[in-house]
A protein has these predicted regions:
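Rossmann-like AdoMet
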Residues: 1-74, 78-132, 136-138, 156
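Class I S-adenosyl-L-methionine
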Residues: 128, 134-191
């Protein structure tokens, strides 16, 4: 048990990462349909191409300022927004040199690759999937649609001028919050 292995509590980021992305078990990694009318929720790019068209219009204004440009999409879902955005950017003569997709879920990454290879094969050489966020700066844009709530994050709170990390424990057959002393790195990042 992960919580027992971590002395009775795990960071919320680890809990969230396990719940969402654990291979074969996590919400985004268990293979069931999540997006669209047959899934649990629908995002704007799946309803209409208008969202991506509007985004492409704004992106083209920014990308045109760079000799070499890139877009980094964080959490590309089914890949529909990436597909439509690249098609619209090409129509605006603003196709980026690179289109990076940072995707944690191997299942979603596979779906994105299948969709994009089948639907826009002429752009596939522009698309690069990343397993980690780039350490070097990109010249261009970072975009994310309906993804912030699916990123594993640490939780913290301030009590009596001290930062506490809010962790997850398991007690009486239920998950519970527990406040722990925050690691110095977390405190430094908050200051």
């Amino acid at each position: 048990n992960l919580i027992d292995e971590q002395a009775g509590a795990i960071g919320f980021d680890e809990y969230m990462n396990t719940a969402l992305y654990q291979p074969g078990l996590g919400y985004y990694s268990a293979g069931c349909q999540k997006f669209g009318s047959d899934g649990d929720f629908v995002t704007a790019p799946e309803v209409s191409k208008l969202f991506s068209k509007c985004l492409a219009s704004q992106c083209s204004q920014i990308l045109d300022d760079f000799e070499e440009s890139a877009i980094l999409e964080i959490g590309a879902g089914t890949g529909i927004m990436a597909r439509d955005l690249l098609l619209d950017l090409d129509q605006c003569n603003s196709l980026p040199d690179k289109y990076y997709i940072f995707e944690i879920s191997a299942d979603l990454k596979q779906k994105q690759q299948k969709l994009l290879k089948q639907s826009i094969p002429k752009y596939i050489d522009h698309i690069i999937w990343l397993d980690t966020l780039p350490e070097r700066k990109i010249k261009g844009l970072i975009i994310a649609n309906e993804v912030l709530d699916a990123l594993p994050v640490k939780r913290f709170k301030k009590e009596s001028n001290l930062f506490k990390e809010v962790k997850v424990t398991f007690s009486d057959n239920k998950f519970c919050w527990v406040n722990t002393t925050a690691e110095p790195e977390l405190v430094d990042s908050l200051m």
